[in-house]
Each structure stands twice: as structure tokens, then as C-alpha cells.
Amino acid sequence: MNIPNVSGILPSADDFPGEVVTRAIVRDVDLGPGAGVLALITLDNGHDHTKPNTFGPQGLLSLNAALDAAEARAAAGEIAAVGVTGKPFILAAGADLDGAAAAITGAGVDPEEARERALGIASLGHAVFRRLGELPVPSFAFINGVALGGGLEVALHCTYRTISSGVPMIAFPECFLGLVPGWGGAYLLPRLIGPARALKLIIENPLSQNKMLRGPAAFELGIADAMFEPADFLEESLRWASLVLTGAETVSRPGRPDAADPAARAAGTEEEWAQAVAAARLFIGGKVHGAAPAPYRALDLVAAARTASRDEGFAAEDDALADLLLSEELRAGLYAFDLVQKRTRRPAGAPDKSLARPVTKVGVVGAGLMAAQIALLFVRRLQVPVVMTDLDQARVDAGVGYVHAEIDKQLSRGRISPDAANRQKALITGSVAKDAFADADFVIEAVFEELAVKRQVFAEVEAVVNETCVLATNTSSLSVTAMTSGLAHPERVVGFHFFNPVAVLPLVEVVRGSSTDDAAVATALAVGRQLKKNCVIVADRPAFVVNRVLTRFLGEITRTVDEGTPFEVAEHAADPLGLPMTPFLLLQLVGPRIALHVAETLHDAFGDRFAVSPKLRALAESGKSSVYLPDFSVDPEVIELLGGGSAPSTESEVLERALEGLAQEIKIMLDEGVVAAPEDIDLCMILGAGWPFHLGGITPYLDRTGIAAKVNGVAFRG
């Protein structure tokens, strides 16, 4: 097949000097009498699973060459089918985006040429992948491992698909990064499984902490036609393919496959498509408030897919992908993605891993909601005994009961087996006596946020644990060093600050107090890795990173309300950023009393940069937990509390003031050595506060907009 003429447009191998080429390696498999020979293409870049297969230009051309040979052999009657699978544990992780971005916008490339190059990459992907569905023989995708973006699109172009039940990740993460599924995904997936299910993968999951599916969930959605266990996945997939080829196994497809009208061949009715698209548009608006173009472009592609021909759908994807490959959104997204992937592997300031102590039993002081969430995470991830304590048996029973109930939920949803549920329940126990911590290796407190209370807790725990037990605090703002006053071994106390909800947010701030030794920090980091959390080491300064930055941001906005800015103006001033929630929804999540406590702590430490809002105090003292009623209408009693003032600001003035406050505070934090570098601030805000990927990190955003230079006289990255 002749691929599009992209000579002179498509970046050459010289433009992709770092491309790790994914080769298409072909071998024949005899499927037996009546089925014939299947030409099995294995995608393999020559590395193990820690370096996934990706598609750059040379990788695409390697697959194209394999398909040239397969097409010729099929025409000659030598093969009855073509199969595609990947190296162990990996099908493919999509396009080589770093290489593509560098090649498209490299030195000396003018804007017109850059777009032509981007269009060339988009067109090449379509031209190669679509051949899998246009061969003279059926094609089979055997999804043996991770399939992300272009990796999933390879499978969608095939006639049939099998999937391993052990696949850990299958997804379209493009909108998370600032792109669209541009090699067939936005057209093919909704036509296969219906618009509502497709939009969950294409838009909802990427904008929800980049959620991934596992193999069974993908099979349930209809992405694959059959599912097999990983131990004999390829053998069973080949056996199934032989049954399909001989007619012993039939696979139904949605719509009327032979109809001339594209709409008649697609899954779902016109009404179902309209409803799904409308719901997705509302969802996007609530998530990004118009600030990120990629999800809107993806939605437009899906909306058009029902009636568009394949050529029309793919051409629209080419156009969208070319535009977005050149966007600031993608560059920001790639910065954030690289930061999360690379900097979390070895946190700045991390001591030698060999200093970490083994953890075979965990203690949790407290049995409230936060403590119970922490205990549940330890049970699930560490699979070691966890004991909770509290002041009375009723509280202990409630905490243990919460853990049991959450395990039962996992069991009812089929996510764990009955045996696993029983094992996990057996690991969690409770006691009113701290003697239960005597043989614990790691004890974390999650009690009331008051220094005297936490000091008392640590004094009681230290009296019963062994000398090597690490004592951790989940404090969100208090001094770790101050908590160690009077302890015999302050060197083993470390901050271990989770974010709420514990199971969802991936960040843990590991706080080094003035006496904390390397063994305690190394153990905390090792535990964080076992919990599948990303750790950042921070200095023992009030509120650490995320809460300090958020409190300054929220404080600047609430101060404008004190001055007379109407609630609606202040609440929506930051909408252009596309933050995960508005300021007063954030206040609701944190709780006015906790927000007031953190603000007072920071005011005591840093003065009027963190002025305590009289209206925040009034809200906290009123007992109201939110500005909003349960139906999300505004509570008129709260609005009355927030009224007054004579110097209102506009939305743009509120946003400018809040961002300038952030620029000032982050510069001060870096000067204080709260973290090692601006990248650590960025990482904390992305992982702990949901700072949007489409903005990149917070410090490059403040540089890009000129706010950092305006406020501080210098950019964060000179």
C-alpha cells in the first residue's frame, strides 16, 4: 500500500535522534486444519517492560513494511490471517510524544512547516494503522499488556481483539496531556462500544486523575471480543482465532455492518449519541471551564463519528492532532508528565535506600475517617498487620468497621476475591491501649490537629515501641520538630502527610524535622513506594508545600470578598485556569474550621501575607460547613455572612491578585529551602492539589505568563 506522500514533511530519522524504534517482528503460526497460517506481528523495541513500546516515524514504517509483506502473502493465499501482539507485558504505550514535539518545533522550523510536519505524523499513523482493518484477510489484536493511546488504536483497527485479564492499564490518556486520540480512536471506539462508554475512556477518565482500566473492565465495555488468563494468553488467543477462522466461533458487531450509511453501522441510536455528547460537554465544562482545548476537540470528533465516513473521521482526527501537537497545552502537559514520571523515581534529597528499615507491622493512632482511610491503605498495599487505637472502644470499633466495610465494597464489585477480603480483614485490629504498638515498626498518628495533643501521643507511643520503630505524623501544617520536644529519640520522627481522599491523591509530603535521621526518611520513602504513592521531601516549615500554596491562593481570594467583591465574582475568578474546583468548593472540601486553623498557623508564622479573613472566621464559627446547600444552590445565610465591604474587584483583578500572591509565596518558599527546586513545587501541586496538566507546572505557568518576573523581578527559570 502506498502511504501518503510525506517526504519533506515527515521529520526524518535525523530529527528523531532519540527514537527507540519499535520493530514489527513477524513469525508464522499454523492454526491447524481449516484455519490456515496466521502471520503474527510482535511489537518489540528491544528493551524490557520498563521501557514500553512507542511509535515514532521509524517504528510506524517498520509496521508498515510488515503489513506490506502480509498483504502480498494474503493475496497469494499463503496466510489466512494477521495477528498483532506486543513484547511481554506491553502492547504499546502510544506515540513517541517527546520526540514528536521536538521534531515538529525544532530549531529552524517555521510555523507553517511545523504544522505540515505535525500533519505528516498524524497522517502516517492513520495510513499505517488502518491497513490492519483493510487487509484481504482478518486481523487479530492480542492485547497482552499495557495498551495506551496509539497502542489501543492499533487494536481497534483490527477485525477482532482478545485481551489478557492481567492487563494493568488500558486507556486513552491523550486529553490528560493536551491531545486527542488521533490515530483512529476518536472515530472507531464510539462506533464499536457506543458513545457513552467511549466518552468515558476518551474524556471522563483522562480528566479524572487520568484513570486507567484493567483488562476485565475493558472487556466488559466491549473493547475486546474474548478474554483469557495471562498464563496461557497467547496460546488461548491463537486457539480462539482458529475457531473464528473456521466459523466455529462467531462475533457479533453493533449496528448493521453491511449498511451503506455510516450511521447504520455504528453502535447506538441518534438519541443516545446526542445524550452522551451533551453529558460529556457538561462534564468537560465542570472540569476545565473552557481552559483546555483538547477535550472539546475530542468531543467534537466523537460527535461527528456517528455519521462520518472512515475517511472523513480520520481526516478530522489528522487536523485536530496537527493543531494540538503545536499547542502550548501539549508542551505544558509533556512537562508535567515527564516530571511525574521521572522526578518521583528518586526524590530530591533522598538518602540511601539501604537505610530503610523493614516494616512488618503498622500502628495507626486515631480511628476517625482520615485514620481509617490510612489504615485501609496500609492493609491493602503492605499486606501486614495494622492496629488502630483511639480513646474508647466505640471509636476503635467504628474505625475498624469502616475498613471492613470498604473491603466488602471491593468484594461486592468483584475487585478482590473472597479469600483476599478475608485476609485483609484479618490484618486490621483495634485497641484502646497503645501497648498494641509494642512490636510495630511504623506508627503514624492521625489525631486532632493540635500540637499538645500530638506531643502527648508521641510520648505515649515512644514508651511502648522499640528503639528502631519510626514514628510518623500526618500533620498538615504543624511543626514536626516541635512535636518531638521531650522525646528520647526525636531522630525517628518524620512527617508523612497524606492528602484527602487518601486512596485517590497520589502525593505524600515526607517532612524532615531538625532531628530526623536518614533512616527515618529512607523508611518513610520506602513505605510510600509500597503504598504506590509519590513522595516529595520537604523541610519542616509551616503547612509544608501544598497547604501553604493553597492557603495563600485562597487567602488572596477571600480577602477580596472581605473588601467587598461579590461571592459569585470571587468564586469564578479562577475559572480560566481550569482548576479541579472553585475556591469555595475547595473550602468546603477542607472544611472552614480546618482552613481557619491553617490560616491562623500561617499568620502566626509569616504575618500579614496570610491575613486571617474575618469572614472565614465568621463562617467557621457559624458551624456552616459550606457556602453551598446539598443541592449546590448558594446558602443565603452564608452569603449574608460574606457580605459587606466597599472596594469590590473584578474577576480579572481577583485572579491577577491570587496569581501574584502565588508567585511571591513560591519564591519565598524556594529561598527558605522548603524544597530543593521549583520542580518539586510543581510536582506537589500537580499530585496533591490537582494543578492541571494542561497548564504544566505552576512555576513554568507563572514564568510563561510573566507574573513571576513582574512580582519577583526574575523568572523561576532564568
Language-model region placement:
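N-terminal glycine-rich phosphate-binding loop for ADP-containing cofactors
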Residues: 2-36, 58, 66, 70, ...
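STAS-typified acidic loop motif
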Residues: 34-61, 88
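Short, glycine-/small-residue-enriched flexible loop/hinge segments at domain edges that mediate gating
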Residues: 44, 78-89, 101
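Amphipathic alpha-helical interaction surfaces in cytosolic regulatory modules
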Residues: 88-102, 129
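Short, active-site-adjacent cap segments at secondary-structure transitions
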Residues: 89-93, 148-149, 478-479
